[in-house]
From Swiss-Prot:
This is Envelope glycoprotein. Residues 628-661 are cytoplasmic. It comes from Cas-Br-E murine leukemia virus. Zn(2+) binds at H86, D117. Glycans are attached at N43, N199, N322, N361, N394, N430. The chain crosses the membrane at residues 607-627.
Length: 661
């Protein structure tokens, strides 16, 4: 067999490839920016392109980012569409049937319009794709033990691979550039992103070619480095060459990733946050329908404002509390907390559902990371939970097998280290250090007894204790969905209470939506402000004065910047002036002794140091003489007593003598 134009023995190629493979592994970062919610599902499309970067094969699925790595199975001839002329498909349109006449049968062409007999011996002409007979010869080459094909990377190769050439050599200008393929020396690599091989056996390919179909399908699999790369949205390219006698024909192909959101998020109109700040709408009195046989036109309910949403939160909390414990609502006050955190979570132990395909709510993830700053209780945890949060776990599942989607029960959410989400991807959970806790959301509504409210209106002379307030999530009985559902066994109002709880959950869900819209509008406002500030209007207007100014030269709408920093400086100056006045007023009310401490810092230190000894000395001078006199008098009295005892010991008492008359 005649060697190729840059022929080397397979043994030499194996040694050189092994030497080059030790030089390192290429890690590619960048590309698609990481999204906020790693469990959110997107519409992902893997596209295989030809040398003109036209899509010739694609596969689509709904999965989280960087979790779906399917096998790509394009046909080798599809990669040659609009490619080099020697492949015979330079004018063949993509996504169409194979070109050319079919093969003839074994008996001298019984099929009308056939080209030649596929059972006859194949000549040494180069394999092509324009007829069934040529595609059959291509299949024989790609499956032959001493022939085949090899792949060379182009866009992501390391620096030492500069000798591999460019598009003219299909990135395979020298031996050692090949990283995968199906050839006699079995080319491999430890850093390339893909492996390529045949997807059919020789007999299966022969049968498909004789039926005038695409009969040279490849199977492209992603390697470990390829799954770690995040630059697939820009695309990567490779070269493919056949290993045959003479010059090795080749082509180039690419692989790229296309990501789109499942649901559109299109803002309409000006900033909706400012126009949405409306008070609670008044209820419209019900009117009887007019007597008419014509059907009434359904009316669209007005959009709720901020006041309506806040009132719905308090009303939903009251209805839930009233149906579960009516004694607490006979006389009470429910207050919606007006400062963060606005919500608190209660960990619950409930059963989730597992799905093989992504449900609809998995694509409705938030655009921003919402964090719960207060979570109580014990519930179900997934992933590797740190020690600081293990107190929230009643049951922990470190890993979840398979590649499924875990949907939280109705009325609950997964509180993860990456934010709140209604759906989890086990693939993301097992590949990352993320952990999640199943929680129920409760608005920060404070429960007050009537005594607390009454004391607020009593005279100020009465001493008021610090109020003991409880939020709904911290009430002794607990108002979680699990606790409400437990009342079904005892009858009573469990079903109605569950409906009230769901109404409260719906109110919280609407409020969270508005919070997300507010964050989005704030982001857009900051972006718009930064664009305005970056325009150096004054200087550029002078440069483009002949064209009518900067806006006329750029053909853009003029932007104007309202600078309020001067007002801020004036306010700060007035604040400093008031502080100085208060300081002078405070100093004028001090006595001369207090003023000494404010004049010099060393004087304060000196006084505090010698004050103790001076006080002790003063006390000694005042009370020392009196104490000394009393002590001397006491000693004299004791000495007099001792002297009297000594004198009495020298004399004896005489007994009286009685004389008889």
């Amino acid at each position: 067999m005649e060697g190729p134009a840059f022929s080397k023995s397979p043994k030499d190629k194996t040694i050189e490839r092994a030497f080059l493979g030790v030089l390192g592994i290429l890690f590619v970062t960048g590309g698609l920016a990481s999204r906020d919610n790693p469990h959110q599902v997107y519409n992902i499309t893997w596209e295989v392109t030809n040398g003109e970067q036209d899509t010739v094969w694609a596969v689509t699925g709904n999965h989280p980012l960087w979790t779906w790595w399917p096998d790509l199975t394009p046909d080798l001839c599809m990669l040659a569409l609009h490619g080099p002329t020697h492949w015979g498909l330079d004018n063949h349109p993509p996504y169409s049937s194979p070109p050319g006449p079919p093969c003839c049968s074994g008996d001298a062409g019984a099929v009308s319009g056939c080209a030649r007999d596929c059972d006859e011996p194949l000549t040494s002409y180069s394999p092509r794709c324009n007829t069934a007979w040529n595609r059959l010869k291509l299949a024989r080459v790609t499956h032959a033990p001493k022939e085949g094909f090899y792949i060379c990377p182009g866009s992501h190769r390391p620096r030492w691979a500069r000798s591999c050439g460019g598009l003219d050599a299909y990135y395979c200008a020298s031996w050692g550039c090949e990283t995968t393929g199906r050839a006699a020396w079995n080319p491999t690599s430890s850093w390339d992103y893909i492996t390529v091989s045949n997807n059919l056996t020789s007999s299966q390919a022969t049968k498909a070619c004789k039926n005038n179909g695409w009969c040279n399908p490849l199977v492209i699999r992603f390697t470990g480095p390829g799954k770690r790369a995040t630059s697939w949205t820009t695309g990567h390219f490779w070269g493919l060459r056949l290993y045959i006698s003479g010059h090795d024909p080749g082509l180039t192909f690419g692989i790229r990733l296309k990501v789109t959101d499942l649901g559109p998020r299109v803002p309409i109109g000006p900033n909706p946050v400012l126009s949405d700040q409306r008070p609670p709408s008044r209820p419209v009195p019900a009117r009887p329908p007019p007597p008419s046989a014509s059907p009434s036109t359904p009316t669209i309910p007005p959009q709720q404002g901020t006041g309506d949403r806040l009132l719905n939160l308090v009303q939903g909390a009251y209805l839930t509390l009233n149906m579960t414990d009516p004694t607490r609502t006979q006389e009470c006050w429910l207050c919606l907390v007006s400062e963060p955190p606005y919500y608190e979570g209660v960990a619950v132990l409930r059963e989730y559902t597992s799905h093989e395909t992504a449900p609809a709510n998995c694509s409705s993830g938030s655009q921003h990371k919402l964090t719960l700053s207060e979570v109580t209780g014990q519930g179900r945890c997934l992933g590797t939970v740190p020690k600081t949060h293990q107190a929230l776990c009643n049951r922990t599942e470190p890993t979840v097998s398979g590649s499924n989607y875990l949907v939280a029960p109705e009325g609950t959410l997964w509180a993860c280290s990456t934010g709140l989400t209604p759906c989890l991807s086990t693939t993301v959970l097992n590949l990352t250090t993320d952990y999640c806790v199943l929680v129920e959301l409760w608005p920060k509504v404070t429960y007050h007894s009537p005594d607390y409210v009454y004391t607020q209106f009593e005279p100020g002379a009465r001493f008021r204790r610090e109020p003991v307030s409880l939020t709904l999530a911290l009430l002794p009985e607990g108002l979680t969905m699990g606790g409400i559902a437990a009342g079904v066994g005892t009858g009573t109002t469990a079903l109605v209470a569950t409906q009230q709880f769901q109404q409260l959950q719906a109110a919280m869900h609407n409020d969270l939506k508005e919070v997300e819209k507010s964050i989005t509008n704030l982001e857009k406002s900051l972006t718009s402000l930064s664009e305005v500030v970056l325009q150096n209007r004054r200087g550029l207007d002078l440069l483009f004065l002949k064209e009518g100014g900067l806006c006329a030269a750029l053909k853009e709408e003029c932007c104007f910047y309202a600078d309020h920093t001067g007002l801020v400086r004036d306010s700060m100056a007035k604040l400093r002036e008031r502080l100085n006045q208060r300081q002078k007023l405070f100093e004028s009310g001090q006595g001369w002794f207090e003023g000494l401490f404010n004049r010099s810092p060393w004087f304060t230190t000196l006084i505090s140091t010698i004050m103790g000894p001076l006080i002790v000395l003063l006390l000694i001078l005042l009370f020392g003489p009196c104490i000394l006199n009393r002590l001397v008098q006491f000693v004299k009295d004791r000495i007099s007593v001792v002297q009297a005892l000594v004198l009495t010991q020298q004399y004896h008492q005489l007994k009286p003598i009685e004389y008889e008359p």
